[in-house]
From Swiss-Prot:
Pathway: Cell wall biogenesis; peptidoglycan biosynthesis. The keyword Nucleotide-binding applies. It holds the Pfam family MurD-like_N. This is UDP-N-acetylmuramoylalanine--D-glutamate ligase. Its main location: cytoplasm.
Length: 446
C-alpha cells in the first residue's frame, strides 16, 4: 500500500471517478481538496462536508500548492492550468495509477477504439466460469478504485486513451489494443497518430501482448523484441486465434484447430466474433482453462446498447447500437446488416471533430435513408444528401420513421457520435430509443 501521508492532494473532477478518489484518500487518513470546471458536478452532494472544493474553473493556487494532482479522464492534460502544474514538476496521475499501486494480483489491460467493454466483460465471465474471483472495472462504467473494496484473484480493466495518459505504472500481466480508428479528435488535435500513441502506452510494461493481426495500427514498436515480450495474435483470417471453416460451418479456431461453432455464440456480428477471439487470446495469456472459456462464450449474451436487437415484430427489426460513438463503430455495424427492405439509419450527436467521409460509401444506395439529429446533423446528412432527413432530436426522427417503416425494414440507431450534446450519456440515448420502440409497438403498431 502506497503511503500518501504528508502529501497535499488535489482531485480534479467530481463525477463518479472523482468521488471514488476522495473516498480512497479518506480511507487512508488523507483529506484532499477537490475542484471541477462545472458549477454543478454530478457527485457534489456525495462530497463529505469537511472537504474543501472549488467549482467553475481550476484554481491555479491550489494546483501549484499540491504535491500530487489526481485528474479525472474528462479533463484534458492540455488544459492551461494543468500544463502549468506539469511544468512546475507536480505529479499528475489518474485513478488507474492509484489502483495499480495497490494491487498485487494479475491485471488484464484492454483498450481500443471499439469493443473494449464487450471483451472486458467476456474475459471476466470466462474467469468466473473458471471459479476465479475477478474484478472488472475501468472505463466500462465501474471505477477501478471501487474494486479495492473486495479481494480478487484477477482484475480485468477497460482503459480509455485518457486513462492511459495519466497512468505510469502499467506492469500488467497482459495487454491488448483491440483496434484503432479515429475518435476523440477534439482531444487529439494532432490527429490519429497522437491518439494512437496514447493507446500504445498500454504495452509499455506488459508481459504479454495480444495483437490484432488485422489492424497494423495496434502493433507496438517493440513487437519484434522476443526477449521483451510474448505475443499472441488474433484476427478474422490469420493469427493464433481466427475464424475458419470446419464441417461446412464457420468456427472459432485456435492454432489451426476448431474450438467452437460460431452458431453456438449468442453475440451477433462479425465484429463480435473478433471480440470473442480477442477474449480467448487474453484468457490463454492468464491461463484460464479452455473449457471455462467455451462455457462463457455459449452463455454470454452481450452488453446493452451494443448492436442490441431490441425488438423484431411484424417483419421489422429495431437495433440499438447507441454505443457507436465513432465512425469505426458505425461502419462495423453496417457491415453486419442484411436488409430486405429499407435501412432507416439514425445518425447524430457530437462528432468530436471527426472526419465522417469514410462513412460515405456505407450509406449510399436506394434502400437506405438517413435520419440525422443533434449537433453534427448537417455534416452527417451531407453523406447522402438525396436520402437524408434532418431533425433536431432523436425522438423527432423516430416518430418520422414510425410512420414510414414496413415489413422487411431495419431501424438502426448507430450514431457515429458522442451523445453529450443532448443526453447525459450513450446509455440514456439508447434507453430513449428503446422506450420509443416499445411505445410504438405496444401502441399504434399493434
Amino acid at each position: 500500500m502506497t503511503n500518501y501521508y504528508g502529501h497535499n492532494i488535489v482531485i480534479i473532477g467530481l463525477g463518479i471517478t472523482g468521488i471514488t478518489c476522495v473516498n480512497f484518500f479518506r480511507s487512508r487518513g488523507i483529506t484532499p481538496r477537490v475542484m471541477d470546471t462545472r458549477y454543478n458536478p454530478p457527485q457534489l452532494n456525495q462530497l463529505p462536508k469537511d472537504i474543501q472544493y472549488w467549482l467553475g474553473e481550476l484554481k491555479i493556487e491550489w494546483l501549484l500548492a499540491a504535491t500530487l494532482i489526481v485528474i479525472s479522464p474528462g479533463i484534458s492534460l492540455s488544459h492551461p492550468a494543468i500544463n502549468t502544474a506539469m511544468k512546475c514538476g507536480i505529479e499528475i496521475i489518474g485513478d488507474v495509477e492509484l489502483f495499480l499501486r495497490e494491487v498485487t494480483v494479475p491485471v488484464v489491460a484492454i483498450t481500443g477504439t471499439n469493443g473494449k467493454s464487450t471483451v472486458a466483460k467476456l474475459v471476466g465471465t470466462m474467469a468466473n466460469c473458471a471459479g476465479l474471483k475477478v474484478g472488472v472495472g475501468g472505463n466500462i462504467g465501474y471505477p477501478v478504485l471501487s474494486l479495492l473494496q473486495q479481494s480478487h484473484q484477477l482484475y480485468v480493466l477497460e482503459l480509455s486513451s485518457f486513462q492511459l495518459e495519466t497512468t505510469k505504472n502499467l506492469k500488467v500481466a497482459v495487454a491488448t489494443i483491440l483496434n484503432i480508428s479515429e475518435d476523440h479528435m477534439d482531444r487529439y488535435p494532432l490527429g490519429l497518430q497522437q491518439y494512437r500513441e496514447a493507446k500504445l502506452k498500454i504495452y509499455k510494461q506488459a508481459k504479454i501482448y495480444i495483437i490484432n493481426d488485422d489492424d497494423k495500427l495496434t502493433l507496438p514498436a517493440n513487437s519484434t523484441n522476443k526477449e521483451y515480450c510474448s505475443i499472441i495474435k488474433f484476427g478474422i483470417k490469420s493469427g493464433h486465434y481466427c475464424l475458419g471453416d470446419y464441417q461446412g460451418k464457420q468456427w472459432l479456431m485456435a492454432y489451426g484447430k476448431p474450438l467452437l461453432d460460431c452458431n453456438e455464440i449468442k453475440i451477433i456480428g462479425r465484429h463480435n466474433l473478433l471480440n470473442a477471439l480477442a477474449a480467448l487470446a487474453l484468457a490463454e495469456a492468464i491461463a484460464i482453462p479452455r473449457q471455462a472459456c467455451l462455457i462463457a462464450l455459449r452463455q454470454f449474451s452481450g452488453l446493452m446498447h451494443r448492436f442490441e436487437l431490441v425488438l423484431e415484430r411484424k417483419g421489422i427489426r429495431w437495433i440499438n447500437d447507441s454505443k457507436a460513438t465513432n465512425v469505426g463503430s458505425t461502419k462495423a455495424a453496417l457491415n453486419e446488416l442484411t436488409v430486405d427492405g429499407t435501412l432507416h439509419l439514425l445518425l447524430g450527436g457530437d462528432g468530436k471533430l471527426a472526419d465522417f467521409s469514410s462513412l460515405q460509401p456505407f450509406v449510399q444506395g436506394n434502400n437506405i435513408h438517413l435520419y440525422c439529429f443533434g449537433k453534427d446533423s448537417k455534416k452527417l446528412a451531407a453523406l447522402n444528401q438525396h436520402s437524408a432527413t434532418i431533425t433536431q432530436t432523436l425522438s423527432q426522427a423516430m416518430h418520422i420513421i414510425n410512420n414510414q417503416v414496413k415489413a422487411g425494414d431495419v431501424v438502426l440507431l448507430s450514431p457515429a457520435c458522442s451523445s453529450l450534446d443532448q443526453f447525459e450519456n450513450f446509455k440514456v440515448r439508447g434507453k430513449t430509443f428503446t422506450n420509443l420502440v416499445f411505445e410504438f409497438n405496444d401502441g399504434n403498431n399493434n
